[in-house]
Each structure stands twice: as structure tokens, then as C-alpha cells.
Amino acid sequence: MKERKYFGTDGVRGLVGEHPINPEFAMKLGWAAGRVLSENGTKKVMIGKDTRISGYMLETALQAGLIAAGIDVVLLGPMPTPAIAYLAQTFRAEAGIVISASHNPYYDNGIKFFNCRGLKLDDKVELEIEAMLDEPMTCVESDKLGKASRLTSADGRYIEFCKSQFPQSLSLEGLKIVLDCANGATYHIAPSVMRELGANIITHACEPNGVNINHECGATHVDTLKRKVLEHNADVGIAYDGDGDRVMMVDHNGRVFDGDDLVYIIACQAAQDDNLGGGVVGTVMSNMGLENALKAKGIEFARSKVGDRYVMELLQQKGWTIGGESSGHVLNLDLISTGDGIISSLQVLAAMVAQNKTLQDLGTGFTKYPMKMINVRYTPGTDPTKAPAVLAAVAEVEQTLGEKGRVLLRKSGTEPVVRVMVEAEQEKLVIDSAEKIAAVVESMSKQTD
């Protein structure tokens, strides 16, 4: 299959104001997507965004391009990414478009698409849109132009949906929860969901101003959350990322529970309820300890490429429902079609309440292997991972580790870095091995400059 030019592992991403994240390209992308998507007959698309200041600009440009292609646009305003997927599905729209750069700083932004089933677009459709971008932009006849409207009930609809995924027989009454919304898209959703289910909520980073999204807060910066959990003697802390599709949690002692931990807890609860529906999908980055812990409980485990779209693909191939990434993307296809930070955290909270256990208690039985990851920048257009010296260094480390460890070398799908990851039972061996491989990768990268 032809390689995509603009679409990466999570849509189109970049620095605001630079190609392709500028008004001109966004309008052309809206038009191209409108032309491709309208071939299916439905002429309605929903657009949502996170809280970045550039969202207004990109939203308007996308809207103009779609309308020029004859597509009706429904504006959702600031909403979590999974909410946009859900609403596009329930409103029978041809697509949901998300304007967000997830956990990245405010000066980055991105555009990604969900189809009418709430799933990310197939590679084939993305290639069709890219091919249409090469065509000159035209406008449909005036009487066939699209229209724009705003769905003012979007937040209320999604709050009720999230609450409906929490067991009717349970309540969060008596739980004190610190909630970090990353000054992002969950700021007006998650607190309402938790409060209406009975929890005592202490909020942090719930006041977006357009430029503070993910700034020293959220799922990628949990130090403040840890401190606040301890300060307030809270039962648990929850941190979402800027667009609400990732989640990290903190127990009452300040220990961080990442995506691997949460997948383990959710899968174990599902197995206990006789509702697992097969095995669990992780990625090549999932900790070896997760695989071993699940297998010890008789739960099959499979690995996909990195990216929640690939976790989804493998889940669908196997007919399973639960999977996720250590970064905090957690999927449960019985509940929603994409990773949802709020719903994933509700599943963990439900397990705490149902079993009358702390988050710490639920994590017993899963011990992570020591892991070291080093990011090495490289020149775009080159591939140091295929250099003979790098392959030799990897082979040497793999021979030393044997079956008690593993090495992963991969290029990021969103930035020009090679990720060097080593896992093993002994921490010193892990660090030494990762640094050894990274040094060779770096030397090869410099040679290609």
C-alpha cells in the first residue's frame, strides 16, 4: 500500500502556523475529506476540538472546506476525542473530525477523523483523501453548499453516556477523588460525571485559557496530582490528557498506575465477572510483567504495533474487547468504540467499589519489569534502525538477555526520534543495555546528517 504523506499514526499533526497545520491546508483538507466522504451518500460531519487557542482557527477553516464540498457541519465545541467519536456514531454522521494534538503543548495541533461507526479511518480512506488534496479545490453549486449548526447539548449528552457505563447498582459515594483534566477537553465533563455519581471531587487543571493545556499537568505530568492526593488524603487521583483519550491514576500512597496497570485491573475485573470475552491486547511497548501477570491468571495476551488504532485492529481480528497501551490509552469495545479516559477510569473505580478495595490492592499480582527507554533524534528521511552496527548491537544485547528480557527499537510515528527500549529482570542490566544501543543509534544518526 502507498505510504501516507500527511496522515500519521494519529491523524495530521504539526506546529501551528506551519504546513500542514495552517488555515490554508485545513480548508483544503476539509474540502478533500468532504469530497471523499460524501461518496457514501451521507452529507453530515461533526467537528469537535480540545481547548487549544488554535482550535478556533482550524475549526473555521475545516468548516469552510467541508461546506464548499456540500457537507453539512455540526459544531460540538470543546469535547473529549472519544465524545466526538460517540456523537458522530449516534447522530449517524459520515464522520467526526477532532482538532487536537492530544498530550502535546498548545503550540502543536492536529486533525484526525472517525468514521460513522466511531472508528478511526482506514488507511485506504486516508490515502483517498490525500489523493484528493492534489486536485484543484472547487465549490459545489450555490444551492448545494453545506450548512453549519451547533449542538448545544453535546456536553450533557456525553455526561449521561459516561454515567450509563458505570454499574447501576454502584455509587462513588464516600470516595474522595483528585481530578486533573490537563486544562483540556474533559474539564467540563469529568467533574460533572464524578460528582453526579456521588464522589467528593477536588479539581486541578480544570481552567483552560487556550495556552495552558497539558502544561505541567495531565496524564503526562502527574507529579502535581501525586502531591495533591497526599495533601488531601484522597482515595485516588485521576489524570487525563488534553483530549481525554488517555488516563493515568494515582493510589492513596502516591503510586502512579499507568495504562498497563489499568488494563490489568480492568481485565481481571472482567474475568471475575465472567465478561472478558477472550484475551487482552497490548502493544510491543507493554511491560513484560503485564503479559506474565495475565497469563498467570489464564488470560491470553497478544501484542500489536504501537498506536491505539493498531490495538483496535488486533482486538477486532481476534474478537476480543479489552486492550490498551502503557501510555494510558485503554479500550473496552463492549462500552465504546475508541479509547476513553473517563470511561476507563470509571471502570477502575467500579472495581474498587465492587470489591471494596483500594487502587493499591487491585494492583497486586502485577509486578513490572524494570524498563529503560531512550529517545534518539534522527534526520527525517533516514533510518538508523536498519544500520548494520545498530542491528549488531541489538543482537548482542538480546543474546545477553535471553528469555528474561527484550529489546525494542522503533521509529516514532509522530516525531523524528528512534525509541530504544529495553526490559529485563535486573535494572542495572536494563540501563546499561539501553544506553549501549542508544549510543550506537546516535552515532549512526550523526553519520547520516
Swiss-Prot record:
Organism expressing this protein natively: Pseudoalteromonas translucida (strain TAC 125)
Protein name stated in the entry: Phosphoglucosamine mutase
Keywords attached to this entry: Isomerase, Magnesium, Metal-binding, Phosphoprotein
Keyword Phosphoprotein belongs to the record: yes
InterPro entries, per the entry: A-D-PHexomutase_a/b/a-I, A-D-PHexomutase_a/b/a-I/II/III, A-D-PHexomutase_a/b/a-II, A-D-PHexomutase_a/b/a-III, A-D-PHexomutase_C, A-D-PHexomutase_C_sf, A-D-PHexomutase_CS, Alpha-D-phosphohexomutase_SF
Binding locations of Mg(2+): 102, 241, 243, 245
Cofactor binding remark: Binds 1 Mg(2+) ion per subunit.
Family to which this protein belongs: Belongs to the phosphohexose mutase family.
Function: Catalyzes the conversion of glucosamine-6-phosphate to glucosamine-1-phosphate.
GO cellular component, one term: cytosol
MF annotations from Gene Ontology: magnesium ion binding; phosphoglucosamine mutase activity; phosphomannomutase activity
Post-translational modification: Activated by phosphorylation.
Catalysis performed (reactions): alpha-D-glucosamine 1-phosphate = D-glucosamine 6-phosphate
Protein's gene: glmM
Pfam families per the UniProt record, alphabetical: PGM_PMM_I, PGM_PMM_II, PGM_PMM_III, PGM_PMM_IV
Gene Ontology BP term (one): peptidoglycan biosynthetic process
Cofactor names: Mg(2+)
EC number: 5.4.2.10
Active site: 102 (phosphoserine intermediate)
Residue positions, PTM Phosphoserine: 102
